[in-house]
Amino acid sequence: MSPVVLSLTGARKAFGADELFSDLSITLARGEHLCLLGPSGAGKSSLLRCLMGLEALDGGTLALADPAAGLGLVFQDFRLFPHLDALGNVTLALRAAQRLGAEEAEERARDALAQVGLEAFTHKKPGALSGGQQQRVAIARALALRPAVLLFDEPTSALDPERTAGLGAVLRGLTERGVALLTVTHDLAFAEHWADAVALLRDGQLTTPLPAARFFGPEAPAAVRAFLSPGAAPEEPSEP
């Protein structure tokens, strides 16, 4: 069994009197890809921001196996500097976040771009890249920091099926190298095909992560089946 790299226990987040989620726990193992599904407004993106420290949790404990490695986040609305080429975008972010010399930063940036299949596009500016290639630059930018866990917020929202498949292949390559992934998405097909495990965040509660085949199968919990096919799965009766 792969070692655990991230453990979130009993997390709670509220905005005033409105509780977004409570008693939420997640465990991620090295090289695991977990997808979180849920309706809009369920708190999925807020959860990612809390994990990154961009928002504060109102309760709970986050533990990382390697705090020095930390986490990386690829935003849904990522931005690249249009006047810099792919290598420059990654190198700039790396040098801003870590005190590296120019030579070491460039070497790590080239390695990150190679990991996402852009070694032949290092000197292309964003305007000369497709949307999918621009997204890979954003992934390389986060990957160059060498995080133990990468977080993705709706990574397929602007991609067509072909580019979505390309992204899935890139992410699978990362997990094969030991990077753990936590992806928030509305793309059911992406989660079913590319995730190792899938969980549902709804009404402030997170279901137990299940292997993708089981999550999307006929024996999934009633709450999951109701989300996937509204009206098709009645709630299971409670114990008397």
Which residues make up each language-model segment?
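A short, proline-enriched helix->beta-strand linker immediately N-terminal to the Walker B motif
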Residues: 144-148
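Conserved ABC ATPase signature
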Residues: 125-129, 133
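A short, surface-exposed alpha-helical micro-motif characterized by mixed small hydrophobic
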Residues: 191-193
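Conserved ABC ATPase "signature" region
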Residues: 102-121
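Helix-to-loop junction immediately C-terminal to a conserved catalytic motif
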Residues: 52
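Catalytic Walker B motif of ABC-type/P-loop ATPase nucleotide-binding domains
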Residues: 150-153
